[in-house]
Amino acid sequence: LNFKPEADAQWQELADIYTEKTGVKVNVVTAAANQYETTLKSEMGKSEAPTLFQVNGPVGLASWKDYCYDLKDSEIAKQITSDDFLLKDGDAVDGIGYAIESYGIIYNKNLLKKAGYTQDDIKNFDDLKKVAEDITKRSKDLGFSAFTSAGMDGSSDWRFKTHLANLPIYYEYQQDNIENTDAIKGTYLDNYRNIWDLYVNNSTTSPKQLSTKTGDDAVAEFVTEKAVFYQNGTWAYSDIADIGDENLGMLPIYIGVDGEEDQGLCTGTENYWCVNKKASKEDIQAT
C-alpha cells in the first residue's frame, strides 16, 4: 500500500518489472492524498491485505505494531548503516526508513537577486524579516511577492500546523530535555507566531483569503514566479523543477532563537516500510 500518490507511476512500473523477473504478481494500491490511514484500515480488513505497508513513525507504529513483522534479521536491515533509520519497538525492528527528507524555505535565486539579495544576506529570522518586508514594500515594482500563499485547507495546512510547528517544539525539547509532550510549556510560541505572521503578511494573498487557498495555489505561485519564498520540502521537487536546478535553493526556517545562524534544514525519516506479519509466509518471503 503506497503512501505517496506522486510516486504511483514509479511503483506500478517497479511492480511490473519485479513480476516479469520473478513471476511473482505484485499489486500496488495507492491511497489518495491525506487518506492513507483510512485506506490502510480498509485494506487491512480484507482477505488479501497488503503485505507491505507504511507507518509515519512512532505515532503510526502505535496503531499498527501488532501487524509488524520483525525485520531484525532481514537482509535490508543488515544494510542499514545507522539505527536512526530503523523504527524499533524494544529489540524488534518494526520498520525500515525509506523517505529521508528535508524541508525549509525554498527560494527562487533569480527573484531574490532581482530584489537585491542573496542567500548570504539571510542568516536568521531578523534577516529574513527584513528581506521579506522590503520585498513587500516594493512588490508592485518588482512584480512578485515575498512568500507564496499560506493556504489553510487540507492540501496545505500540514506545512504549518505540523512542519512549521516542529521548530518551536524542537527548541523547547532541546532546552528543557523534554521526553514527552505533556511537559511542553510553549516556551517558543511567540517565535511560532512571529514566523507565521511574517508568512501571511508578506505573501501573494490577503490573510482574509487563506482559508480558500490550496497547496496547488502555492505551487502555481512559485512556479510562475509570483513569489520568492515557498515553505516546503524535497518531496516537492517534481512540482517546481521547471524553474531549473540552478535557480532553486533552500533556507532553514528561522524563528528567532539564539544560535540559529548555525541551524540547518529540518531533516528526518518521514516514512517507514513495514511487513504485515499476518500475511502468508510466501508473501512475506517475496516481500
Give a label for each model feature:
Residues 24, 44-55, 142, 224-232, ...:
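Alpha-to-beta junction loops
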Residues 16, 21, 25, 46, ...:
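Extracytoplasmic/periplasmic substrate-recognition and gating elements
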Residues 132-133, 178-212:
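Glycine-centered hinge/linker elements that transmit conformational signals in sensory
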Residues 3-60, 78-81:
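Early extracytoplasmic/lumenal segment of secretory-pathway proteins
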Residues 30-39, 125-127, 209-223:
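Short helix-initiation/N-cap motifs at beta->coil->alpha
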Residues 70-84, 147, 151-154, 168-194, ...:
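Short, solvent-exposed loop/beta-turn-alpha elements that line the ligand-binding surface or hinge
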Residues 56-110, 159, 165, 249-251:
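Hinge/lid segment of periplasmic solute-binding proteins
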Residues 94-98, 103, 129-181, 227:
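Extracytoplasmic/periplasmic solute-binding protein
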